């Protein structure tokens, strides 16, 4: 019963987060290049990066779940009971979490299908300020694989990018400050191990890595950047290129045109990495030999802007290669499609942000219009306030996601540092002291005597301090009071009194 309560309280919060996708026929967990590599034998193509096995016959006979990329299957643990029975495999459809947008369009008189797909990893899940950095296995928070697909006359092009939290041991716990300072954990050796394992895995999966780090190079973020730069230099992986760009400093005072500095710096390597291109009859013409791995502190707002710019430049190259655009033509000049491109990338930014923070992305006015606007700044302010509230007053419940009237279970969950997302995707790790010094969150279904006594006492002596309604009210009191003060302050300014003194007194009263 206790276990049932934990899951019933946590799973709806996970499932209500947009969006989950599945397909009856397509391998949506794979990029086109990865799918092509698994379907056929291309052992030599990606050396020394990808060590694909030649298993085309085995691949063709497997179900969608069996041949899926397990990093992106969010219902993998739920489908395990079906895996033992071959006749049930057709019902075991892998589900991804992220973003999908399929858009027929016309460019220069040619019909194309432009698709954007993002897949969130299940290997280090959690909410914004509660799950940061990497773990001992090299898995990082908010890791998302984004693929841009272009289909023209039977030919298909694919361009893949990734994002993920800074691969070091660090955290940024909410403390009621608007921007809690990130803090490094562990020693230099642990940071090196986390970075090394993460990057080795990324090189194996995607090829050469260009780490585009957009965090501030001063202050608290600057300490993270300095440590990451030092660790990257120490590890000295020949297949990893580190590219730091202080987004806020370079683009201060709304000088967003200065992003061209970064784009010029990475232009050559983007051309060298190329993209995947497959002809109508199935033969490939090009393969992507590396990816851009972009991050900021959240891997959201700044990351979205840069990824959309890299995607636009790739789209330009693809359309010219497929003879949709002539050499003198630009994607930006295709007015209708350019509007579609900007809006889809902005919608993508919002969705990835909602999944990690609970609000839409910041700076999407630049993605939608190509420039920063005053209305965009106001919208960023509104979303920042919502983020502040959710990070400090709501995400803790989502992270722990247990009934507030079971205090000893709350303690057990906190001790084991597990959340509803980890339980949902099957990532719960048993600690050596679990069940000894503290109760396991995956304890047997039989409730112990403490729980039975607790329920009996609650039924005869309801305690207001332990009721969910009272707990929610207690946590809602501070933000509601703040909102009331702000509302009254706004009203006082909007409806002035006859005397200036009365206005000032009203402002001082409600602001205080």
Which residues fall in each region the model found?
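Phosphoinositide system proteins, centered on phosphoinositide phosphatases
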Residues: 1-285, 314-512
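A phosphate-binding catalytic loop at a beta-strand-loop-alpha-helix junction
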Residues: 290-309
